[in-house]
Amino acid sequence: MRKTVIVAMSGGVDSSVVAYLLKKQGEYNVVGLFMKNWGEQDENGECTATKDFRDVERIAEQLSIPYYTVSFSKEYKERVFSRFLREYANGYTPNPDVLCNREIKFDLLQKKVRELKGDFLATGHYCRGGADGTGLSRGIDPNKDQSYFLCGTPKDALSNVLFPLGGVYKTEVRRIAQEAGLATATKKDSTGICFIGKRPFKSFLEQFVADSPGDIIDFDTQQVVGRHEGAHYYTIGQRRGLNIGGMEKPCYVLSKNMEKNIVYIVRGEDHPLLYRQELLAKELNWFVPLQEPMICSAKVRYRSPDEKCSVYPLEDGTVKVIFDVPVKAVTPGQTVAFYQGDICLGGGVIEVPMIHQL
């Protein structure tokens, strides 16, 4: 008897190709499932989720597979969006994609999979592992690997997950979609945070977190060099949006004092204070047993390179990470993912002092 795989379909080309490949294999009963988390409207006033669902319908009809829809909008606001706002208001820079994977896609969606009597959940993530019992590994396409965004998802939650695109390059996915005549073959990839869309980040955030004007201070001279509309709008290492003129070198955000509402900057992209040799990580999730010390590499943001490091577990359940060489713009609230080669060991949330000491 063939087993049933529930494909998380977003209306994009990746999940469309996942459904196509699984149907073509002939080993599974393939069922599509569209998940609505946010009711964002596009520039024409049309809900983007409605447009995406229409694309899911078109693909499901092309492939002759049944499909369902489920709304997690309420839960998404409670478990992802509310925390996103709270963290930003407190000066942190959270990663909502990591939260969404842990709280929604591989928790609530998994419950829906069980309701539909599914044996497997398949997604369009560019990573490997899951149902093969190996935990989590990078996808082979280095430009699309998404293991970073899954590093906070418990191993058990991935135990029945199929990642058909983990061994495929994005260019090949497009080619497969075009040769199969899939309706989404030329659809643009979605980018950015789903609930922000194409709007400037500041104009979005100011709808929920009030402006709080304050000083921008040059950390080296301790002189006021500008004004800001709210320290929560800025993240460590940020260059754009400071609106500071008359400097010989570009300015970068060094740190923030949320109590005094001060943003500190330094001049020059290679200023030594922009680099840190160590960090603490909390809210940890491991795919392998933690050894002491663990010699590995770490990514402190999605597009950053791997940095060699040593990881030391602490008594309070956090870990201290010491890098072989200092790393630029380590940001509190962001996600750190740990690797040995292509294997993702786990991940956590970065905790570093927000204020540099004089």
Curated annotation (Swiss-Prot):
The gene is mnmA. This is tRNA-specific 2-thiouridylase MnmA. Catalyzes the 2-thiolation of uridine at the wobble position (U34) of tRNA, leading to the formation of s(2)U34. It is an enzyme of class 2 (transferase). Residues 95-97 are annotated as: Interaction with target base in tRNA. It comes from Chlamydia trachomatis serovar A (strain ATCC VR-571B / DSM 19440 / HAR-13). Gene3D superfamilies: Adenine nucleotide alpha hydrolases-like domains, HUPs, Translation factors. Residues 144-146, 301-302 are annotated as: Interaction with tRNA. One of its GO terms (cellular component) is cytoplasm. Disulfide bonds join 100-194. Belongs to the MnmA/TRMU family. GO terms for molecular function: ATP binding; tRNA binding; tRNA-uridine 2-sulfurtransferase activity. Keywords: ATP-binding, Cytoplasm, Disulfide bond, Nucleotide-binding, RNA-binding, Transferase, tRNA processing, tRNA-binding. CDD domains: MnmA_TRMU-like. One of its GO terms (biological process) is tRNA wobble position uridine thiolation. The keyword Electron transport does not apply.
